[in-house]
Amino acid sequence: MNNTGQHGKFEKINDEFLNETFGAFEVLEAIQTKYGKTDNDTIINEARDAMVAKVLGYGNVNTDKHGWDAKMDSEEFLEVKQSSASAGHICATFNDTSLEKAEELGKDNVTIALAVWSSLRNLLFVVYGKNRKIGPDMKAKIITAKEKGHIRPGTQSISMNDLLFKYGFKIKLVNMKKEDIREFLKNKSGFKTYLIKENRQLPFYDEA
């Protein structure tokens, strides 16, 4: 029998950390009140989505929980996914995706962006692009997961290396230098084959 008490890493509560964090929350709470954004789960995501959208030239952010994350003044939409630089496997995760939404991911007017952050506010780079194959591929993943009886078949991921080398996305650097990103990615799951064994070059948006 599994002992659930063995799971996790338990440490004594750090009062200094607690006080400093809730002090920062007080500032955030004032912003929530000022702008009427009282949903704790979405305010940080909205701010991050807006920053990514701004970096990529999209002027409008979605303040609702449903739909694409940003759009241009034209009918060009942006779907933003976030990842931490400390993650061993960097990927774009699509939660509870319907078959209809999966199909729309491959539309010509939908760009997918994977933003990689080193901290709450430091955006390192964005991997973004579009590819018609993403829609059918995502749809096939969901159907296969349903057939296998997965509890959440609509939650699927696309690895950063697949976005770059399978779907032709490129990297836009924000707060990371080009000479540093290759070394950074060598230690990430999926990149060893491409960057070390095959010596593949990373595609950047400032290159033809």
Predicted features along the sequence, with ranges:
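Nucleic-acid endonuclease domains
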Residues: 1-208
